[in-house]
Amino acid sequence: MRCVPVFVILLLLIASAPTVDAQLKTKDDMPLASFHANVKRTLQILRDKRFCCRTQEVCCEAIKNG
């Protein structure tokens, strides 16, 4: 029963410790904003493709080819 307060204090100290990034950045790391922009662009292309293919078959072929 005497260990419980010590355990609680240790948990509080661990939870309040500052977090540190364990991995150092390399020159190959890309910023998160760039990653989000790529995802956004890809989703936009897929949305356009889906809408276009529903309305016109010719448009769908044009998107597939380039």
Swiss-Prot record:
Q: Which residues form the signal peptide?
A: 1-19
Summarize what the UniProt record says about post-translational modification: Contains 2 disulfide bonds that can be either 'C1-C3, C2-C4' or 'C1-C4, C2-C3', since these disulfide connectivities have been observed for conotoxins with cysteine framework V (for examples, see AC P0DQQ7 and AC P81755).
Q: Give residues where Asparagine amide occurs.
A: N65
Q: Which domain of life is it from?
A: Eukaryota
Domain-level remarks: The cysteine framework is V (CC-CC).
Sorted alphabetically, the keyword list is:
Amidation, Cleavage on pair of basic residues, Disulfide bond, Gamma-carboxyglutamic acid, Secreted, Signal, Toxin
**InterPro entries associated with the record:** T-conotoxin
Give the species this sequence originates from. Answer: Conus marmoreus
Any single GO molecular-function term of the entry would be: toxin activity
Record-linked Pfam families? Chi-conotoxin
4-carboxyglutamate modification sites?
E57, E61
Coiled-coil positions are none
Alphabetical GO CC annotations of the entry are:
extracellular region
Family assignment?
A: Belongs to the conotoxin T superfamily.
- Per the record's keyword annotation, is Secreted included, yes or no? yes
User: Cellular location of this protein?
Assistant: Secreted
Propeptide ranges, please?
20-48
Name of the protein in question: Conotoxin mr5.2
Q: In which tissues is it expressed?
A: Expressed by the venom duct.
